[in-house]
């Protein structure tokens, strides 16, 4: 049973990168996330898109799992690759 959460949030895609951003989230990024899950780093995830509200947080995902495994995931090269790629596509990216 999950006792912790890893938050990955963003503002919006960089102008002109909208298609690339959503393709990444729906294909390569999803494949990477599924591999992290298969490797036991987290138990489940949720994706959330927010309606327009004038703020700078417009979408996020939550990875649910055990704190030690989520901490371990954050230190893997594969997760760093995922975050760095997402950071080239999404403005205001943050991982907490």
Which residues does each predicted region cover?
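Short S/T/G/P-rich N-terminal loop/turn motif that feeds into the first structured element of a domain
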Residues: 1-57, 65-75, 95-96
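Conserved short beta-strand edge segments in small beta-sheet-based binding/regulatory domains
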Residues: 81-96
């Amino acid at each position: 049973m999950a006792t912790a959460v890893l938050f990955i949030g963003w503002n919006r895609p960089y102008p002109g990168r909208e298609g690339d951003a959503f393709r990444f989230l729906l294909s390569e990024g999803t494949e990477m996330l599924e591999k992290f899950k298969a490797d036991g780093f987290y138990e489940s995830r949720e994706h959330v898109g927010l309606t327009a509200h004038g703020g700078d947080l417009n979408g996020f995902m939550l990875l649910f799992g055990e704190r030690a495994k989520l901490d371990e995931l954050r230190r893997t090269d594969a997760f760093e690759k995922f975050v760095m790629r997402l950071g080239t596509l999404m403005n205001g990216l943050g991982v907490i």
